[in-house]
Amino acid sequence: MILIIYAHPYPHHSHANKRMLEQAGTLENVEIRSLYHLYPDFNIDVAAEQEVLSRASLIVWQHPMQWYSVPPLLKLWMDKVLTHGWAYGHGGTALHGKHLLWAVTTGGGENHFAIGSHPGFDVLSQPLQATALYCGLKWLPPFAMHCTFICDDDTLQAQARQYKQRLLTWQEVNHG
């Protein structure tokens, strides 16, 4: 099962993430959990989140990039759900062998994240990749949609279809 952990503080403002979720939602064996819908008070049900994670083969962290990082509720979710003895540390093997895909949208262009005057995209992904590896997850190359503030609808739809294809290809290769 593909589990999409979706974290957008203002989902009604997001055209890119909406289209990504619409495309992903057409696939079989996909569950989408919208953190800001489930936990508007930031009171995360850790047991429920761990249970659904245990059923997933591919975990997707999907969100808009905010200040070169994840939205606050996704960070809190990581802190609360990825616990010692469950996700890492002695006895913490619940996520071992599962795959993780970082699916991120940005307002800036891809060149905005080039090495030089701005941190490179590879650098920005390091904390998430380190978290994944620490929990025994297999890190997959990220999926990024750039320039989402200025893209026309046709471009957003095309990129959302690429996202769906990425998930479908993973399912076909991994029988997930």
Curated annotation (Swiss-Prot):
Superkingdom assignment: Bacteria
Main location: membrane
Enzyme Commission no: 1.6.5.2
Similarity comment text for this entry: Belongs to the NAD(P)H dehydrogenase (quinone) family. KefF subfamily.
Membrane topology: Peripheral membrane protein
Entry's localization field: Cell inner membrane
Description of how the protein assembles with itself and partners: Homodimer. Interacts with KefC.
Record-level Gene Ontology MF annotations: electron transfer activity; FMN binding; NADH:ubiquinone reductase (non-electrogenic) activity; NADPH dehydrogenase (quinone) activity
Keyword Cell membrane: yes
Any one GO cellular component localisation term in the record: plasma membrane
Keywords: Cell inner membrane, Cell membrane, Flavoprotein, FMN, Membrane, NAD, Oxidoreductase
Cofactor(s), names only, from the UniProt record: FMN
Its biological purpose: Regulatory subunit of a potassium efflux system that confers protection against electrophiles. Required for full activity of KefC. Shows redox enzymatic activity, but this enzymatic activity is not required for activation of KefC.
Protein name: Glutathione-regulated potassium-efflux system ancillary protein KefF
Residues annotated as binding FMN: 8, 14-17, 65-68, 105-108
PANTHER family per the UniProt record, alphabetical: GLUTATHIONE-REGULATED POTASSIUM-EFFLUX SYSTEM ANCILLARY PROTEIN KEFF (PTHR47307:SF2), GLUTATHIONE-REGULATED POTASSIUM-EFFLUX SYSTEM ANCILLARY PROTEIN KEFG (PTHR47307)
Alphabetical list of HAMAP family matching this protein: K_H_efflux_KefF
BP GO annotations: positive regulation of potassium ion transmembrane transport; potassium ion transport
Catalysed reactions listed for this entry: a quinone + NADH + H(+) = a quinol + NAD(+); a quinone + NADPH + H(+) = a quinol + NADP(+)
